[in-house]
Amino acid sequence: MALKFHVLHQSKKSRARVGKIETAHGIIDTPAFVPVATNGALKGVIDHSNIPLMFCNTYHLLVHPGTEAIAAMGGLHKFMNRNAPIITDSGGFQIFSLAYGSVAEEIKSRGKKKGSSSILEVNDEGVWFKSYRDGHKLFLSPEVSVQAQKDLGADIIIPLDELLPFHSDEKYFLSSCSRTYVWEKRSLDYHKKDPRHQSMYGVIHGGIDPEQRKIGCQFVEDHPFDGFAIGGSLGRNLQEMLPVVDVTTSYLSKDRPVHLLGIGDLPSIHATVGLGIDSFDSSYPTKAARHGLILSSQGPIKIANQAYANDLSSLDPECTCATCTSNISRAYLRHLFKVHEPNAAIWASIHNLHYMQEVMKNIREQILNDEI
């Protein structure tokens, strides 16, 4: 079945809302944080049954083991042994972010310079690129991308789009926006021929140009997408991103869920949930965990600091995750990181993912109380 979206409460204070998305593999309470399982796995976490929605990258799964191989095994849900919703991207995000840097990197001023050799050619038909594994030449078109996502069988899929960095010149930027919407229309047409249980979100581009964002919103509104996704360049920092998200959500109808692509750090979530964002995806909590940054109700903890060398308290006294209830102390976790014990990243990742789910639960409660 295609997804069904229900708004349970609209805040009286902002555009924030509490809702639920029904899919063939389960219900997602919104606003929701969506962790990224790049290769079909959450790094450092074995049990993902308590994660309502996971984001898997089509590009990586296309390169290995191959989406046709996964289809032959019954799809991504069976391959991963997951009986809960999955969202996949088009593959375009990974191709272009490997070349230019991701949206999140750009916001943190770490975007790569244009000219990476991973992209060989971009034209109206699609994009030719080199495999990051062996340099093999690959081609991705709207139809190839959607078929790959059909093979994977994700509940929510994304049409092919072109991700440009902030520093693109205006002429190429405008031609890219036009090409993206042609690609999205082709993606949607291909999807509608065989929708199965899947739903497709339309991606809104336009950079930081309000008029181009309005055009993008009009495009997705005029086509039967099941939800909206805000993509493309969102500026160089949070201050530039906020007006982009604000103007974009102001143009969108309220009957479909809105996802913010590639953004899911805590400051961004707190800043944009009131603008009407229903879901966020990011590898932030697991990546932070692998680098020894622990999220907690008392603020972030850099576990390598000497201050925690003899600290036998739990990572977060308010937390009920498997790490904290197993009495893994700050001192012990610091020791594991210092000796490069793999368990360190596992314990930290379990905690950070649980913490993010609790943050979203608290946000939903605040919206219900019209506090956001």
From Swiss-Prot:
Keywords from the named record: Glycosyltransferase, Metal-binding, Queuosine biosynthesis, Transferase, tRNA processing, Zinc
EC supergroup of this enzyme: transferase
Binding site for Zn(2+): 319, 321, 324, 351
Gene Ontology molecular-function annotations: metal ion binding; tRNA-guanosine(34) queuine transglycosylase activity
GO biological process, one term: queuosine biosynthetic process
Cofactor note: Binds 1 zinc ion per subunit.
Top-level lineage group: Bacteria
InterPro entries: TGT, TGT-like_sf, tRNA_ribo_trans-like
Enzyme Commission number(s): 2.4.2.29
Binding site for substrate: 89-93, 161, 232
Active site: 89 (proton acceptor), 281 (nucleophile)
UniProt catalytic activity: 7-aminomethyl-7-carbaguanine + guanosine(34) in tRNA = 7-aminomethyl-7-carbaguanosine(34) in tRNA + guanine
Region of interest: RNA binding: 262-268, 286-290
Protein name (Swiss-Prot/TrEMBL): Queuine tRNA-ribosyltransferase
Originating species: Chlamydia caviae (strain ATCC VR-813 / DSM 19441 / 03DC25 / GPIC) (Chlamydophila caviae)
Protein's gene: tgt
